[in-house]
């Protein structure tokens, strides 16, 4: 059964990767972090405040995006824009951005990781999960996409999740299980297949562990 799920997951990963790959012959938009700094006014009101909480679809801290991979940020914004991720506020913001805007904003937030790397001490090894969480990680094949320490995704369009706010991770994981709702839910075949294997209590245990790992993600006050 695990081998079958791994095969299905691999096929789904390939299809999602193809979805976000530039069309053949199309030129990928290159982001400019300097230009991006001038375009983040709509971002900093939530993502630039330490401890800021959202209340939709439930109370949770807004995700850390400083240090996140640029290609993932662009992919996420496009998902909000097309309503593959349902979130009225984020959809309105994403719809206001051109491809160049998205690339610039993403480049700006990714650059924070490089800036921090020069000044920050070496990251500590990830703490070992307890037996229950280790079993859940293996069952979900989490590292096969998110990489060692949950900070080295195998594809740049996938997120770094180590050190992300645990309550946000929990809310996001549950959203992949949500179907047929107008304003809540995320359409992603890979993550839906993973999340639906677990109870909400198990998803919370995963989120709490992953959120406890030191990673590149930060909240940088603006």
Q: Where are each of the predicted segments found?
A:
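Inter-heme linker and motif-flanking segments adjacent to c-type heme-binding CXXCH motifs
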Residues: 50-57, 83-86, 111-131, 135, ...
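Residue-level hotspots at or immediately adjacent to binding/recognition sites across diverse folds
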Residues: 27, 49, 93, 148, ...
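N-terminal signal peptide c-region/cleavage motif recognized by signal peptidases
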Residues: 18-21
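Bacterial N-terminal signal peptides that target proteins for export
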Residues: 1-12
């Amino acid at each position: 059964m695990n081998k079958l799920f791994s095969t299905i997951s691999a096929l789904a990963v390939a299809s999602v990767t193809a979805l976000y790959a530039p069309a053949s012959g199309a030129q990928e938009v290159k982001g400019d972090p300097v230009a991006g700094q001038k375009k983040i006014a709509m971002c900093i009101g939530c993502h630039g405040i330490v401890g800021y909480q959202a209340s939709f679809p439930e109370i949770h801290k807004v995700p850390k995006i400083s240090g996140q991979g640029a290609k993932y940020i662009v992919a996420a914004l496009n998902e909000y824009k097309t309503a593959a991720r349902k979130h009225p506020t984020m959809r309105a913001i994403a719809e206001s951005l051109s491809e160049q805007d998205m690339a610039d904003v993403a480049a700006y937030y990714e650059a924070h990781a490089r800036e921090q790397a020069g000044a920050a001490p070496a990251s500590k090894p990830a703490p070992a999960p307890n037996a229950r969480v280790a079993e859940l990680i293996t069952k979900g094949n989490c590292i096969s996409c998110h990489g060692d320490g949950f900070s080295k995704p195998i594809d740049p369009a996938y997120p770094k999740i180590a050190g992300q706010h645990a309550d946000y991770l929990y809310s996001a994981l549950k959203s992949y299980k949500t179907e047929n709702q107008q304003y809540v839910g995320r359409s992603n075949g890979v993550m839906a297949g993973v999340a639906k294997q677990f109870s909400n209590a198990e998803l919370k245990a995963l989120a709490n562990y992953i959120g406890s790992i030191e990673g590149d993600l930060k909240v940088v006050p603006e």
